Amino acid sequence: MKEIEYVKELSYRAKKASRTLKSLSSFQKNKVLLELANLLEKRKSEILSANEFDLKNGKEKNLPSALMDRLLLNEKRIDSMAFAVREIVSLPDPVGEVTRGLTLPNGLELVTKRVPLGVVMVIYESRPNVTIDVGALSFKSGNACILRGGSEAFHSNEILVKLFHEILNKEGIDTSAITFVDKTDRSFMLPFLQQTPSIDVVVPRGGEGLIKFISEHSMIPVVKHDKGVCNLYIDQDADPAKVIPIVINSKVQRPGVCNATENLILHNGYPFRKELLEALAKEGVELLLDPSALSLYPKGRPVKEEDYQEEFLDLRLSVKTVSSLEEALTFIERTSSGHTEAIITEDLNAAKMFTNSLDSAALFVNCSTRFHDGAEFGLGAEVGISTGKLHVRGPMGLVHLTTTTTYVTGNGQIRN
């Protein structure tokens, strides 16, 4: 009973705040966000102290290295958070945008405009920057948000929401516009998923277990940020000068994120497979190899079939050798999570066949899978990267946090 009362109260307050946000001008919203960006830079020491507490707890609990990397904040990452907020400020406000306008033969005037979704709940793990990204995107698009982060990042998330609340209080705006769930017990999660009167959409960001639980139990529409089993295919006509830099960047730059490559597919006609595997090993990547690749690099480990559907989020990579593009496409269709697929090739027909045949949120030609990101796509930041097809696919930015309302003005017309 205690859980239900707590959840209903927080949800009700967020819904109430969402109504007041509709009346804020773009100027008012941008002013708040610019102050937030400045405050993030001014209060770095407080943020880092809170994050250090979470990191210490994480080490004591022996959290995986990939999760610890996502949990880590430093001065550079805080600067990146502030930069992302300013990018959001620079973007057009989607609220009020006219998407359709016409006068019907009977004289009725129709105008369709973008309006906020209402209340967005985001349930996420590890990454404190999500608190700022989601808070800023929701606020700019006129939505209240309910933030339920993981227990491992509790203190980091708490201080970031506190900074947001300081500015909202200063500007006379209801702080429930950015609602922080300060209960990390999972018993509080299920009641939130039943708050259909107050919450309009739930966005889960986290491990496969979290996504599955929310998808199965939510009575509220869910936009899934599912796992990223990203495939990168090296065609027989790939340019060797492009291959190693792209593959290394796709896997090594930040292995603990959803747009890092997990499966490397090698055409057996590509002549520099051995050199590529050696380059990956030199970067500290653990290679899980099929028999063909293992014969080129015996220091690797034999791959298991289930490895090809695993999101490692670590310096670990599964390798598959194929004899044709068609075989590569069949493999991708079987293993992909629908997140990101990429091809490296100089053959335009191969590139066209690749992009026309696959069904994922993003398909890349001759570039790193790491580019599948809201900021890189010019969205400022993202609520998540949706692997579903409704209501958004790919990075979920400002415009995707809106729906539409049609306003009809008449002069006494009735329908025959």
From Swiss-Prot:
InterPro entries found in the cross-reference section: Ald_DH/histidinol_DH, Ald_DH_C, Ald_DH_N, Aldehyde_DH_dom, G-glutamylP_reductase_CS, Glu-5-SA_DH, GPR_dom
Q: Which reaction does it catalyse?
A: L-glutamate 5-semialdehyde + phosphate + NADP(+) = L-glutamyl 5-phosphate + NADPH + H(+)
Which GO terms fall under biological process for this protein?
Answer: L-proline biosynthetic process
What does the entry list under GO cellular component? cytoplasm
Entry keyword annotation includes rRNA-binding? no
> What molecular function terms (GO) are annotated for this protein?
glutamate-5-semialdehyde dehydrogenase activity; NADP binding
Under which pathway is this protein filed?
Answer: Amino-acid biosynthesis; L-proline biosynthesis; L-glutamate 5-semialdehyde from L-glutamate: step 2/2
Q: According to its UniProt record, what is one Pfam family this protein matches?
A: Aldedh
- Which UniProt keywords are listed? Amino-acid biosynthesis, Cytoplasm, NADP, Oxidoreductase, Proline biosynthesis
Q: Does the keyword Magnesium apply?
A: no
Record SUPFAM superfamilies = ALDH-like
Q: What does this protein do?
A: Catalyzes the NADPH-dependent reduction of L-glutamate 5-phosphate into L-glutamate 5-semialdehyde and phosphate. The product spontaneously undergoes cyclization to form 1-pyrroline-5-carboxylate.
Q: Which PANTHER family does this chain map to?
A: DELTA-1-PYRROLINE-5-CARBOXYLATE SYNTHASE, GLUTAMATE SEMIALDEHYDE DEHYDROGENASE
What family does this chain come from, according to its entry?
A: Belongs to the gamma-glutamyl phosphate reductase family.
Q: What is this protein called?
A: Gamma-glutamyl phosphate reductase
